[in-house]
């Protein structure tokens, strides 16, 4: 996948060939090493007592869901807390049944209930679940210009709830756009005057990344702390969420231990020293998409896939010569190692490792009757290599593409088409050939995700890369300033999110695994590429995030 990097500089580098002038980038080394392998003994096994307590508490929460009155603020708050605590996957059927009922009884106008917090929460929960409910019931709190009415001017909880709800707007809902802006500015003003530290932290987190764009696992880690400080919290739910978090964390730690062993055997750090060495960061990426225990096999395989994609990007973008890349691409295209000795040593090492990952994928999927999906996965990896090669040809020939030419290639080189197809190929959920063909056709939701990925990547990497980017090309083509280009591209990111919201409402419930995959991958991009490239430089923000959910228990 394409990840922003610092400016490439030419240097004599001799991995695989002698005295060849190549580009090189001073990436920082792997910061985790064999941490998860060396600390395996510290990652305790889940005891029988913990499993029994976990099951007992889960049943208690189910009873709570059933016993609480339908469509009451307590029921809605309970569902919201369950989901934000990261344990919603245990109660999917119960929550869907409840929200289906709430949707069926959802009024176009609610003349009796004037509680903004409840109305906005209900609106958000239903849209999250894929129900296209109107925003009319929220309109009495917003004037025609999108400003908040005086009646709620100091209702921080209500405005925060409306802010979160407004993030689920779609194109054409201009009133929600205006409400979002009004809520943001009002919340920033109100938290300077509140003495409620917990509420202030909650608002600051929401303004940074709203619920709609938050990774479930990362959000759960933060929300557990906030929920604990809430005097009205449910003790059983809190205990269950903390136990579940720690149990799932141990599973993730053990998975990383096995993956670290694979990584050490590859020894790319020594054999391919020009490439970024980011195994744990790749696992974090995939875990952001699939954190639930049932996706154990998918996490293992997809971490290897994204790791290999990252190295592939560096082969094309940093190290390979044009002649080497031409020959290398032909081998990827054929998906055959016959005659591989024609390639430089570093390419032979890489290609054998790549093909081994797909052999493992085929073996694992054969066990669950999804062998048919592997060809789709391979074809997308081939296509990724082809677009990387196209970009390399542009670089070596000094060709400057038009914005249209660039985006056609760059949406694919963002890697999210490849990762989506590969992910759907290895998850346990049954994905039909018809659904694969639909995804391969690049439907609007996937195109919107790729636009966000590409533009966030280019915005984060602006000024630190010598290759083409949407920022440079837009400035040159439109004759605008850097600030204007950033403003326009951020607007495109915002509109693409609205398209994703729209498609989620349009396509549910038939394509839930596909929608979940696309949305979660897009959320990872928001977390890693807002304001900086936190993958290329994973020593600060990313390290802290990984530590919070993969090292430190709650």
UniProtKB/Swiss-Prot annotation:
Reaction it catalyzes: (2E,6E)-farnesyl diphosphate = (-)-(E)-beta-caryophyllene + diphosphate; (2E,6E)-farnesyl diphosphate = alpha-humulene + diphosphate
Record bears the keyword Metal-binding: yes
Top enzyme class: lyase
InterPro entries the record matches: Isoprenoid_synthase_dom_sf, Terpene_cyclase-like_1_C, Terpene_cyclase_plant_C1, Terpene_synth_N, Terpene_synth_N_sf, Terpene_synthase-like, Terpene_synthase_metal-bd, Terpenoid_cyclase/PrenylTrfase
UniProt KW keywords: Lyase, Manganese, Metal-binding
Cofactor (UniProt): Mn(2+); Mg(2+)
Motif (DDXXD motif): 313-317
This protein's pathway: Secondary metabolite biosynthesis; terpenoid biosynthesis
Binding positions (Mn(2+) 1): 313, 317
GO process annotations (BP): diterpenoid biosynthetic process
EC number: 4.2.3.57, 4.2.3.104
Residues bound to Mn(2+) 2: 313, 317
Pfam short name (any one): Terpene_synth
Ligand binding (Mn(2+) 3): 457, 465
The keyword Manganese appears for this protein: yes
Subunit structure of this chain's protein: Homodimer.
Alphabetized PANTHER family for the sequence: (-)-GERMACRENE D SYNTHASE, OS04G0344100 PROTEIN-RELATED
Entry note about domains: The Asp-Asp-Xaa-Xaa-Asp/Glu (DDXXD/E) motif is important for the catalytic activity, presumably through binding to Mg(2+).
Protein name stated in the entry: (E)-beta-caryophyllene synthase
């Amino acid at each position: 996948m394409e990840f922003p990097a610092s400016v490439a500089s030419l240097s004599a580098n001799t991995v695989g060939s002698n005295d060849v002038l190549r580009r090189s980038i001073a990436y920082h080394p792997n910061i985790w090493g064999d941490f998860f392998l060396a600390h395996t003994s510290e990652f305790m096994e889940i005891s029988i007592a913990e499993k029994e307590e976990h099951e007992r508490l889960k049943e208690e929460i189910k009873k709570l869901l059933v016993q609480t009155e339908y469509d009451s603020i307590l029921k809605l708050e309970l569902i919201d807390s369950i989901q934000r605590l990261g344990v919603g996957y245990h109660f999917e059927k119960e929550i869907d049944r409840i929200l289906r009922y709430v949707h069926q009884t959802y009024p176009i106008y609610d003349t009796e209930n004037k509680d903004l917090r409840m109305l906005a929460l209900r609106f958000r929960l239903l849209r999250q679940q894929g129900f296209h409910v109107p925003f009319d019931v929220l309109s009495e709190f917003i004037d025609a210009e999108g400003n908040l009415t005086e009646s709620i001017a100091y209702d921080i909880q209500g405005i925060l709830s409306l802010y979160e709800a407004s993030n689920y707007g779609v194109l054409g809902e201009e009133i929600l756009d205006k409400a979002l802006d009004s809520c943001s500015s009002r919340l920033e003003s109100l938290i300077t005057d509140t003495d409620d530290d917990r509420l202030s932290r909650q608002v600051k987190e929401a303004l940074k990344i709203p619920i709609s764009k938050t990774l479930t696992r990362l959000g759960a880690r933060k929300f557990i702390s906030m929920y604990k400080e809430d005097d009205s919290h449910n003790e059983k739910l809190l205990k269950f969420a903390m136990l579940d978090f720690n149990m799932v964390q141990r599973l993730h730690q053990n998975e990383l231990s096995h993956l670290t062993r694979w990584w050490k055997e590859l020894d790319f750090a020594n054999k391919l020293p020009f490439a970024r060495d980011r195994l744990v960061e790749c696992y974090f990426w995939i875990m952001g998409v699939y954190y639930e225990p049932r996706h154990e096999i998918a996490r293992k395989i997809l971490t290897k896939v994204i790791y290999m994609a990252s190295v592939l990007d560096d082969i094309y973008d940093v190290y390979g010569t044009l002649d080497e890349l031409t020959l290398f691409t032909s081998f990827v295209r054929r998906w055959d190692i016959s005659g591989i000795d024609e390639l430089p040593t570093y390419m032979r090492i890489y290609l054998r490792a790549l093909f081994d990952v797909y052999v493992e994928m085929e073996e694992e999927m054969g066990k669950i009757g999804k062998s048919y999906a592997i060809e789709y996965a391979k074809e997308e990896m081939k296509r990724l290599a082809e677009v990387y090669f196209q970009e390399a040809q542009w670089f070596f020939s000094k060709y400057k593409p038009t914005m249209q030419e660039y985006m056609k290639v760059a949406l694919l080189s963002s890697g999210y088409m490849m990762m989506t197809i590969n992910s759907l190929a290895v998850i346990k959920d049954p994905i039909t050939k018809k659904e694969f063909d639909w995804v391969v056709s690049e439907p609007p939701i996937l195109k919107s995700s790729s636009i966000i990925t590409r533009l966030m990547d280019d915005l984060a990497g602006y000024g630190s890369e010598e290759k083409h980017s949407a920022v440079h090309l837009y400035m040159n083509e439109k004759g605008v300033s850097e600030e204007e280009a950033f403003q326009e591209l951020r607007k495109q990111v915002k509109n693409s999110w609205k398209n994703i919201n729209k498609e989620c409402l349009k396509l549910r419930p038939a394509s839930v695994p596909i929608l979940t995959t696309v949305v979660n991958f897009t959320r990872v991009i928001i977390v890693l590429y807002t304001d900086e490239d936190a993958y290329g430089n994973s020593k600060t923000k990313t390290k802290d995030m990984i530590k919070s959910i993969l090292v430190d228990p709650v």
